[in-house]
Design a protein with these regions (language model features):
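Alpha-helical cap/lid subdomain in secreted, periplasmic
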Residues: 1, 20-21, 52, 56, ...
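Bacterial Sec-dependent N-terminal signal peptides
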Residues: 1-21
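Conserved SGNH/GDSL esterase-like catalytic core that processes O-acyl groups on lipids
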Residues: 22-27, 32-121, 276, 297, ...
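Structural beta-strand segments of beta-rich domains
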Residues: 228, 236-240
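A conserved hydrophobic secondary-structure block that centers on an alpha-helix together
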Residues: 357-373
Length: 373
């Protein structure tokens, strides 16, 4: 009986200990954090999606106040709202802050911009008092689309100024900067009212925060233009770059050069390769501890970018002198990366699936470098 009681007590203590290890994440912000723009904020807001992505080891709570400003002299200061008090009481281990969009209001930024950095620092310090061990991430602002009624009457320029202020705050307050702007900017359809992300946009924000918290960017990834048979520009310093998990060491090898980089908190890395001599073939190897990508038959030479109208699609075998010209095209020292359009711009109606693909910037078919023949 005594042994049974001891065993039950041990199991209870282990359960309590495990429960205490859950990482608390406080998502602090305005209506975008609250979930205005999605039909069910409890399930579709970015904090709700973040909870799904992080899993059982985390507890994510949202403290979003629609209309809230970062500025304490703004029209609805976040630090005067109940959501701020609730966020302090939550004492998150991780605090994600996205504030400043509403400060583009003409009542706020033009009059009180000089207080923005100090007010943001005060907000950060408040969370550090609530939990001295907390980790803080602050976000660059989500885009405001040109459909916004005040876009050209100051909002666009004030939005840009606030972005710069946020970058300054991240540097001097020593907090992690994440980017809510770049992932959404190419997709204005995800901002139906020009400000609030829809369900898909909220998922994009959740992924951005997930990557920022965990450092998981999906491992080593190279741009699509890197394939076998590619051509690298010769005779000049060459930057090779890609993505990997935060903190991962990346090794790049080519032509007896071996260079290393450590991936930043934003998942990006880059190395500068000393000028390559024209010729080859070379082998380009990019690797981390978990993954390796090898590109064979790589040449160093002149890289030309050719772009234009429909005449750029003209095939050599369509020419009047095709019989003489085509046999001369075979040259293993010439490589071709041909980006063909998925859909032609003829006078035909596209269906909804095509429009959806174009909205997602899926303009071109998958391709790779080929040896000219």
């Amino acid at each position: 009986m005594k042994k049974t009681l001891i065993l039950i007590l041990c199991l209870f203590l282990c359960t309590v200990s495990f429960a205490r290890k859950r990482v608390k994440v406080a998502c602090v912000g305005n209506s975008i954090t609250y979930g205005i723009g999605v039909s069910d904020p409890d399930k579709e807001s970015y904090p709700a999606r973040l909870q799904q992505m992080l899993g059982e080891g985390y507890t994510v709570e949202r403290f979003g106040k629609p209309g809230a400003t970062l500025l304490n002299k703004g029209h609805r200061p976040f630090m005067q709202q109940k959501e701020f008090k609730d966020a302090l009481a939550f004492a998150g281990d991780v605090v994600v802050i996205h504030l400043g969009v509403n400060d583009t209001d003409p009542r706020d930024w033009p009059n009180y911009r000089d207080f923005f950095i100090a007010d943001y620092r005060a907000l950060i310090d408040s969370f550090r008092v609530a939990n001295p061990e907390c980790r803080i991430l602050i976000a660059r602002l989500t885009p405001i689309a040109d459909r916004h009624p005040r876009f050209e009457s100051g909002t666009r320029d004030w939005h840009d100024e606030i972005q710069l202020a946020i970058e300054t705050i991240a540097k001097y307050a020593q907090v992690q900067l994440i980017d809510f702007h770049a992932p959404l900017y190419p997709y204005p359809f995800m901002l139906p009212d020009a400000v609030h992300p829809d369900k898909e946009g909220a998922a994009v924000l959740a992924k951005t925060v997930y990557e920022g918290i965990t450092g998981d960017f999906g491992g080593l990834q190279m741009p699509e233009i890197y394939t076998d048979n590619m051509v690298l520009q010769h005779g000049r310093l060459l930057t090779i770059q890609g993505k990997a998990d935060a903190g991962e060491k990346v090794t790049v090898s080519i032509d007896r050069q071996q260079l290393q980089a450590v991936t930043g908190a934003d998942g990006k890395w880059a190395v500068d390769v000393r000028p390559l001599k024209a010729g080859g073939p070379y082998t380009l190897t990019v690797s981390t501890e978990k993954r390796k990508q090898v590109y064979e038959n790589v040449l160093a030479g002149e890289v030309w970018l050719c772009s234009g109208q429909s005449n750029m699609e003209f095939y050599l075998n369509w020419s009047a002198t095709a019989a003489q010209d085509v046999p001369q095209a075979a040259n293993s020292n010439i490589r071709f990366y041909d980006m063909k359009a998925r859909w032609r711009t003829d006078a035909v109606e596209w269906d909804a699936s095509v429009l959806d693909s174009l909205n997602h910037l899926q303009y071109y078919k998958d391709t790779q470098w080929t040896v000219c023949s």
